[in-house]
Every structure is written in C-alpha cells, then in structure tokens.
Amino acid sequence: MRRLLLLAALLAGPALATDGPVFMGFGSHTPVEADLVIPKGMVLRHVYDVTAATPDKRNPGFETAARFINSHVANGVPERDVAVAVVVHGSAIDELTRAPAYAARNGGKANASEAMVIEMLKKGVRFIVCGQAANARGVKKAELLPGVELAISASSAHAILQAQGYSLNPF
C-alpha cells in the first residue's frame, strides 16, 4: 500500500507542478486532452511576427505569444521548456516604447500593452525590434522598454532565431 501511495504521488507531482497559467489576466487558454502530445523533454522554441499596433487595447499578437506559453504550461509542458520570441516591425514597434515616447506618438494616450510586455519580458519572452523599421519610424533604441532587443532587421532576427531552433508561427 505504501508503495502504491508513493507511486501515485510521484505520478501526480509533474502534473501538479506544471499547472498554469504563467500569465494572469492575459493569454487566455483552454486545457485540451490532445491526441498530438508534446514529447517529454522537448523544448518548444517558437517565434511570432507582429506588425500591427492596436492603440486602444493590448496587442493581440503579443497576447497570442502569452497564450502559447499559458496553454502549453497548463497542459503539462514545464515552463522552462517553452521559449518564445516576438519579432516586431511596423506600427507595433510603438507598443514597445517607454511611456513618454509612446504618448508623444499617440496623442498623449497610455500604452495598453506596456504592462503585459513588461510581465512577459520578466518571464523570459524576447521582444526583438526590426532596426530598419525602427529607423524608418524614428524610434531610437533609448526609447524602447528595458529588455526589448534591437536587431539589424526583422529578417536577420528571424534567421538567427531559426538557426537557434525556433519555429515561425505560420499565422
């Protein structure tokens, strides 16, 4: 009987340890009894490409990246085995700028995505800005939120991430 209890505790341990969500208040997800199961020990490296800003609400492209993390952790993948990057160009770059720079570009409004981005950065999500697009939009590196990375271009960021084993989100 003692061995059965020990075995039950050991089997339940990983499930209890991997409950999500990682992010509260954004990145909504649903537990799924999946047929295509993530192999144990597999590290998921995934990159999203986001171009469009959504000035009056959280950026749905950024939130999709959070959902990817939340859904996989809630379905048993250890948080340490989920790596996400977001390559940003176009008007979405504004949503990665500090409050004064954002307000100056958006009629004094507050950045609805800022708190979400900061929390995601704290959890290891990489936000990488296309340097070519930033230059074209007049965004300086010093205006970016702390932790946001600047690449030569979105293309070079994707090439580097692909070489590091990241898959590109197809939609």
What label would you give each PLM region?
Residues 23, 34-40:
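Acidic, glycine/proline-rich low-complexity segments that act as flexible tails and inter-domain linkers
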Residues 60-77:
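Histidine-anchored nucleotide/phosphate-binding helix
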Residues 18-28, 97-104, 109-171:
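A cross-taxonomic marker for long C-terminal extensions/tails that follow the last structured domain
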Residues 4-12:
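Sec-dependent N-terminal signal peptides
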Residues 13-17:
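Sec/Tat signal peptide C-region and signal peptidase I cleavage site
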Residues 78-96:
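Acidic helix-start/capping segments at beta-turn-to-alpha-helix junctions
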Residues 54-61, 79, 110, 151:
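Solvent-exposed, acidic/flexible segments
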Residues 38-55, 95-101:
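Acidic/histidine-rich, surface-exposed loop or edge segments in extracytoplasmic proteins
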